[in-house]
Amino acid sequence: MVACSIEPIQFFGIAHFFQKLHTSRMSLLSGICKVCVPAPAKINLFLSVGEKRADNFHELRTVLAKVQLYDLVTIRKGKEKGSTTISCPGNIEIANEHNLAVQMVNHWRSVTGIEDGIDLLIEKKIPMQAGLGGGSSDAVSTLIGLNLLSHKKLSFDDLLDLSARVGSDCPSFLVPGACVASGRGEQIREVKPDACKEISGTRVLLFKPSCGFSTADIYGRYQVGDSLFPETNQMDERIEHWESGQLSLIDLMYNDLSLPVLKKFIFITALFKELRERFKLNPMVSGSGSCCFFIIPEGFDIEPVKQLIFDSWGEDIFLTESKLL
């Protein structure tokens, strides 16, 4: 059994190491009946959204970085063959068959033919409807746990294919560090080592209003003509310049979806303006929101900024300091 008390960062690396081992090596784990897998949040450091494709998805390019904010997913072999149970303490509204983690179990069964009962426990720390990828990350951590428990090990390519069936951004959570995603988000590659090393450990402040945003609504309000990078070659060039050191992280940071967000939610626009003018910060929306973030400059006193955010949005918001993995 893998102990649940292991540090999230340490286990996140261990889980991804195990999933890439050869099947014969994985037989050492055949006696496990329960695993606990941390599910990290992500932020979009760069997101450019292109034209809508024939399948109704937009062509996009995005740089996603994992942050030190985790849900914890416990996967246990159940007693009833073919059954799936899910428990989400404090979030009963997502403990149902629509949860992406449950959908991942169903897809995993269809691929492997394994009918073992599966009991899921998801302990949430990542806020929902935030653009932090919590639901997708939970689903992928479920898949990693299932692969650890199973005697039929799936290859990394199989895991990528299976995760893409559940959600466009799911494959990105199979990469432990920062990655570049393209297509509808399902085509991924790791960020080049030098760029990945440079951003690892970077401090960020995450802050989210008490309300969540609908991804479909934000995409529905988006106008491709407003993008600074309407062509995919422009998107790719921007990312390549950053990876090669020609562009700083701050200069890379951009999100097409911030345009409809800031038009609709003027309370975010007002706060962003004050953060830029008073504190010279570069706040961004993550994905389709509603969580926002900025890079914390080295030696910067963050407390006055936190107080400004609380004063602007109220004390019941989500706010936490974190670091990029």
Question: Where are the regions that the model predicts?
Answer:
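ATP-binding N-lobe of GHMP and related small-molecule kinases
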Residues: 18, 26-130, 148-157, 182, ...
